[in-house]
């Protein structure tokens, strides 16, 4: 729901969801979008459901909003290297390899969103925004270390 709100409030933003597996991320996203659109029909009206615009497949989904924003799922693998997004959500980060996250996923967020007037604002809250969602893990794992880093930082 957070990504949907960001897509509505920030035109032309590009966001992503990733997880340990690409199919897992796509399944989570599709399930939650359908649930939210059922509970709050206004969200369904903001998504462009036109043919070939919003895509839903077995291991990929992309939701395009009427203001040009979108969010999709990307794989937590080397094949995602070089993609560019403004922010993202790491779902079940306990299952994501810390090296891949640091070297491939986080660098995808190195671009600033272009506003409707064509300007960019590097200090904008959306840029490089990271949301981590996971179940309880163990000490000395990447998610635990990341939590401590964010709490202390």
What feature does the model see in each segment?
Residues 1-153:
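Phosphate/NTP-binding elements of NTP-utilizing enzymes
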């Amino acid at each position: 729901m957070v990504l949907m709100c960001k897509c509505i409030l920030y035109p032309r933003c590009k966001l992503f969801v990733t997880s340990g597996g690409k199919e897992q991320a796509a399944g989570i996203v599709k399930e939650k979008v359908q649930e939210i659109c059922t509970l709050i029909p206004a969200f369904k009206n903001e998504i462009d459901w036109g043919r070939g615009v919003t895509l839903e497949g077995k291991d990929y989904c992309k939701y395009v909003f009427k203001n040009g924003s979108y969010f999709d799922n990307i794989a937590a693998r080397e094949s995602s290297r070089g993609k560019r997004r403004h922010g993202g959500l790491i779902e079940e980060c306990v299952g994501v390899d810390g090296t891949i996250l640091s070297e491939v996923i986080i660098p995808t967020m190195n671009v600033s969103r272009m506003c409707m007037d064509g300007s960019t604002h590097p200090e904008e809250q959306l840029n490089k925004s990271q949301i981590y969602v996971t179940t309880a893990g163990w000490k000395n794992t990447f998610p635990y270390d990341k939590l401590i880093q964010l709490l202390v930082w």
